[in-house]
């Protein structure tokens, strides 16, 4: 079955083989590449990620989305063209043993964070601090018994660099792929001042969360569970022990797939 | 003499009385209030901040600016209308005992940061970690002997909240003045998740800088010198000892005033 993670800036795809119960990460498509360049319809981009052989075998897909409505409209119509019906999963108050910490308005918790919580609860039989470093850096506390204790949302690296460009007259146009170095040091020019500043803010937020975890997990052991494209880089700078799960969200979607046909 | 700090989002004014050598903070004018509302010319706003009695006594002003060119044009023409000639100060490689850490391109260091370095060197006879929490959060390392070791630039609180609004579909429109609480806690709704996330990133960056200061100051004592509107709030969350200087930048401008007539 096709698993879809429609994120803020790109959509990621994976294939769950129900026979082997294995999840294979297929690839990601940046939203800008199809929203700006209509010469290459999304349907063709999808066929570069998902093989037609897989699509013939299974016409159902399951996904979650925090993407903008324009992205969703195009994604749904392109998948329908390929004969695929998508079951979009919503955040709930309780599911698969996890209790949502947003007690007043559970549906307001991002569905990407919800799926990662479900996936983590199934994979990590331990208190977990989930660090998802993508377009935004999200941090969530999840107890071993499935209680979600809430979390944080911080602008990711590129959003931070953009924010300085917009808010000031002289600090424009730095992009993430210009950054190579791990570790923290004082910046001796504007480029390093800004890129190291973003690194300090992102790693600083994670360090604050790790410190707070003692209180939240009553000084019991916990795992730092890292996912998202920028996660590994940040943890190397922090030199903190962590376990990496690239498919945490997809593991959550796979759990939801069980209920599709039940 | 009128002292002017033309910042990213507002201009701040102070009066230096050369006889008493005292600096009186006069007030600030947000740039949007004159750029958007031409019905109230900047000249009138200035006269609400600076008394005509002061303007008659002294027709020279000294300032530094990181503001956009539209702001500077309006500011200069309005001050000229009031008969005031402004000596805008630029960042240098060396001045008043301070050596700029941007060795390759010293002029690229923000003049607001340069003035704060000059003011700090004169006021604080100690190694200093300067934390200026304004539109951007800037952090600078300054040795007791006047050597500047470089620094960081991080989006300030409102820029971080805006960044999430721009980079994601569902996290829009949170403003700084909605925030009351000190201290850090997991967010149990989207508002708290974002505002606490910004708090964690800003305090986390400062905490990372404090940690790095041991290395930069070779484990010698140092002061955490805090300035900028958001500084006190952040330091209360960090519960770290610090000394507050509201007029650090103006103290730097006052040092430059000595050379105006020499």
Curated annotation (Swiss-Prot), chains A, B:
Residues binding K(+): 132
CDD domains: ASKHA_NBD_PanK-III
Keyword line: ATP-binding, Coenzyme A biosynthesis, Cytoplasm, Kinase, Metal-binding, Nucleotide-binding, Potassium, Transferase
Coiled coil: none
GO molecular function, one term: ATP binding
EC code: 2.7.1.33
Compartments in which it is found: Cytoplasm
Cofactor(s) required, per the database record: NH4(+); K(+)
Binding site for ATP: 5-12, 135
Record bears the keyword Calcium: no
Binding of substrate, residues: 102, 110-113, 190
Single GO biological process annotation from the record: coenzyme A biosynthetic process
Active site, UniProt feature: 112 (proton acceptor)
Domain of life: Bacteria
SUPFAM superfamilies: Actin-like ATPase domain
Pfam families: Pan_kinase
Principal localisation: cytoplasm
Cofactor mode of binding and number, as noted: A monovalent cation. Ammonium or potassium.
GO cellular component: cytoplasm
Involved pathway(s): Cofactor biosynthesis; coenzyme A biosynthesis; CoA from (R)-pantothenate: step 1/5
Family: Belongs to the type III pantothenate kinase family.
Protein's job: Catalyzes the phosphorylation of pantothenate (Pan), the first step in CoA biosynthesis.
Assembly information from the UniProt record: Homodimer.
HAMAP family in UniProt: Pantothen_kinase_3
UniProt name for this protein: Type III pantothenate kinase
Taxonomic source organism: Idiomarina loihiensis (strain ATCC BAA-735 / DSM 15497 / L2-TR)
Classification of source organism: Bacteria, Pseudomonadati, Pseudomonadota, Gammaproteobacteria, Alteromonadales
Gene: coaX
């Amino acid at each position: 079955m096709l698993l879809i993670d429609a994120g803020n800036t790109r959509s990621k795809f994976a294939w769950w083989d129900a026979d082997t119960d294995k999840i294979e990460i297929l690839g990601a498509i940046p939203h800008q590449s199809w929203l700006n360049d209509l010469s290459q319809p999304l349907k063709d981009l999808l066929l570069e990620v998902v093989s037609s052989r897989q699509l013939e075998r299974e016409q159902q897909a399951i996904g979650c989305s925090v993407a903008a409505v324009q992205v969703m409209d195009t994604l749904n119509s392109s998948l329908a063209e390929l004969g695929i019906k998508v079951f979009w999963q919503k955040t709930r108050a309780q599911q698969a043993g996890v209790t949502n910490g947003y007690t007043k308005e559970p549906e307001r918790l991002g569905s990407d964070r919800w799926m990662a919580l479900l996936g983590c609860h199934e994979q990590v039989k331990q208190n977990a601090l989930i660090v998802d470093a993508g377009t935004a850096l999200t941090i969530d506390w999840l107890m071993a018994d499935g209680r979600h204790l809430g979390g944080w949302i911080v602008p990711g690296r590129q959003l931070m660099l953009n924010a300085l460009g917009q808010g000031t007259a002289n600090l424009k146009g730095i992009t993430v792929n210009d950054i190579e170095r791990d570790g923290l040091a004082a910046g001796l020019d504007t480029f390093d001042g800004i890129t190291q500043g973003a690194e300090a803010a992102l790693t600083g937020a994670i360090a604050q969360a790790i410190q707070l975890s003692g209180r939240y997990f009553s000084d019991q052991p916990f795992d730092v569970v890292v996912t998202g494209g920028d996660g590994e880089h940040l943890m190397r700078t922090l030199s903190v022990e962590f376990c990496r799960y690239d498919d945490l969200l997809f593991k959550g979607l796979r759990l939801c797939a069980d209920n599709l046909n039940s």
